[in-house]
Amino acid sequence: MSAPAPDPFAKIRNATNAHRERHGCSAFPYANGPLLAALAGAANARRILELGTALGYTALSFAFGVRDATIDTIERDPDHVALARENIAAAGLDHRITVHEGEFSSVLPTLDPGYDVAFFDGGTPVPALHKALRGLLRTGGTLITANLNQGGTADSVRKALFDGKAWRSALVDEHGETAISVKL
């Protein structure tokens, strides 16, 4: 059995974790950037939307997964926005990744629909944001939802993702934290 491919952005993931510990903030990078890169590649994504930039780890992972995709990523913390922009520019990908500063609910209505992949990793999933993401995804587009094990509103989102009416969904980890859903 061969070893998994190295994570080209592990340094940024580790820096994000260190930043969170130092500052006590909510910068949590998704633990498996290579999985996100592979999913975006499998979906042949051209447009990707991310909610929850932190320091740019997952946006960079998506860009690595599909070499000609453009990524819109949203972050409300101005310090995280600045650090993400620095990391993205240092990787030479600032021409493909746009970091939008603001609340999800304020930025999402300004974006054009037709995304191939959307990724929610910005805290506890809430139904209103998932409804907005559904409106921005094309039919057949892929929604990746993290943090489904946080209870509260996440339970409502999980129920909607698995009702079989609007999405075809599967969990991607044994803890039930992340779902991959295709918009029907």
Task: Enumerate the language-model features and the residues they cover.
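A short alpha-helical cap/connector motif
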Residues: 1-117, 124-144, 148-184
